Design a protein with these regions (language model features):
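A short glycine-rich, Lys/Arg-flanked "PGG" loop and its adjoining helix->strand segment in the class I
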Residues: 155-165
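Active-site capping/gating segments
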Residues: 182-221
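Short amphipathic alpha-helix with an adjacent loop that forms part of the alpha/beta core around
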Residues: 132-139
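Conserved beta-strand signature within the Rossmann-like core of class I S-adenosyl-L-methionine
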Residues: 164-178
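S-adenosyl-L-methionine
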Residues: 2-81, 95-98, 102
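SAM cofactor-binding core of SAM-dependent methyltransferases
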Residues: 85-132
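A short SAM/SAH-binding and catalytic strip from SAM-dependent methyltransferases
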Residues: 141-156
């Protein structure tokens, strides 16, 4: 890393901290402060906390692995984003949704997460809460998320039960459950959706892109 880059990152981190630190837990803020600069040039996948901060600071396109940029490109190609959307697991700072909102020509984006505390952010609608199968999704055209961990199962079941499209980039943690390996987890998800599809007539795909680390799930009519 050049000295110029190091200084620029420290400046952006200082500005970011001043503006947003009050919305973070102590441990999450410490993680961002410790890793924002020294992980910027990593070629591995980066924690969501850092992705949110880099996106807000306009740094995502400089990352070796721009996960948010890739996800936005794919969801725009694979889905119609012009409608009322719900992002589940947006994190502390919902910068992915803010960037996606700029690509919409109509519609709204609502973000939902139990850790979100910021009252206003761009043109987004904000819900502090945990997504469950009982969450009212009747107003949304599409539910989406990146690496939502424990919300994955609820998002899938909600999509089928409420006949709402889903676009989901899986994480690598297998939903916190103990599977023999990640592929066993994928087989479990596929079997679950096959059963739900047979009951509802809703279609699904599990697929991969080379610029995203884990598979994606899409449900649709």
């Amino acid at each position: 890393m050049t000295l110029e880059t190091h200084l620029r990152l420290n400046y952006l981190l200082s500005q970011y901290k001043t503006k947003y630190e009050k919305y973070y837990s102590k441990s999450d803020l410490e993680y961002v402060m410790k890793n924002f600069v020294n992980r910027f040039e990593d070629r591995d996948c980066i924690n969501n906390l850092l992705l949110q901060a880099y996106e807000e600071c306009g740094l995502s396109e400089e990352l070796s692995v721009n996960l948010y940029g890739s996800f936005i490109n794919h969801i725009r190609t694979d889905c119609d984003i012009n409608g009322d959307l719900l992002e589940v697991g947006c994190g502390v700072i919902p910068s992915l949704a803010k960037s996606l909102k700029r690509r919409q020509t109509s519609g709204t984006i609502t973000v939902m997460d139990p850790v979100i505390k910021i009252p206003e952010y761009g043109d987004l609608r904000i819900i502090n809460g945990t997504f469950t199968e009982q969450t009212d999704v009747s107003k949304y055209k599409l539910i989406y998320g990146t690496f939502p961990c424990e919300a994955t199962s609820a998002m899938i079941h909600s999509s089928y039960e409420n006949d709402v499209d889903l676009y989901l980039a899986l994480c690598g943690c297998a939903d916190g459950k103990l599977y023999l390996d990640y592929y066993e987890y994928l087989f479990y998800l596929e079997d679950t959706m096959e059963t739900l599809s047979n009951k509802t007539g809703r279609n699904f795909d599990i697929f991969e892109y080379s610029d995203l680390p884990y598979p994606l799930i899409k449900t649709y009519r």
